[in-house]
Amino acid sequence: MIKLLGVFFVPIIPFSFVVDYVFENCKSCRNYFFPVLVLLGVLVGALGVGKAGTLLILLAVLTSIAYTYRLFRVQNYEEWLLTYYIAVASLSWLHPEKMLFFISAFAIPLTVIHFLILHMKNQGAKPEVEEFKGIATYLPVLGTLAFVALVSSLVIAPAYAFFTLYGVFKGNLILTPILLIEWLVWLWVGFKMFSPVFFEEKAEAPKYEDLDFSEVFPLTFLLFLGLLLPVL
């Protein structure tokens, strides 16, 4: 039963298509769809799914490749979050015993990014590159948290995840280059999507407010947990 739920909450093809459909069509639940999905994924990892068979492993690798390729076509930050999460989380099926730690490494910083996006949406911003251009300059607290979360999700989390999977792809001449190429794509697309946030400016200052303490504290705490996870 847990494994059946797992293929939806730690999505792999074809079950990931259901996740895509709900995400695209449930506009009323869009703001909290992603954190609920990753929370359920963490729960599945905590409960344990047992060993993954050959078919499940093949589907997991196929899912990761397909969603990594899809990253080239994402149009906004919400699409990037979900697509990137599925691309990386699906690989946790290669080592289900470590699924909890694997997923958590990505879920924590990506959830922080989600709530930073939500903070902007609540002020009327659309989750698009043009809307977020230069935001880090005018909203330094949000910009700092976004930068740390981005580095954590694109650099620290994959490094930790690959260390977790080392025993799986060690000596595998097919899987190893696939994972390395995927990581390069994740880095390139991620920094390309977010570089306007940090390195470009709008013609006039945007009329958005920065985070207050009630928002900064829990997000900073989450980031601290994410950075601490690799040494646990």
UniProtKB/Swiss-Prot annotation:
At the top level of its lineage, which domain of life is listed?
Bacteria
Q: Give the protein name, as stated in the record.
A: Uncharacterized protein aq_836
Key words, A-Z: Cell membrane, Membrane, Transmembrane, Transmembrane helix
Q: Where in the cell is it found?
A: Cell membrane
Q: Which organism is it from?
A: Aquifex aeolicus (strain VF5)
> Which regions span the lipid bilayer?
4-24, 42-62, 100-120, 145-165, 171-191
Please indicate if the UniProt record lists Transmembrane as a keyword.
yes
Report the main location listed first in the record: membrane
Membrane topology note: Multi-pass membrane protein
Q: Hey, what's the signal peptide range on this chain?
A: none
Q: Which GO terms describe its cellular component?
A: plasma membrane
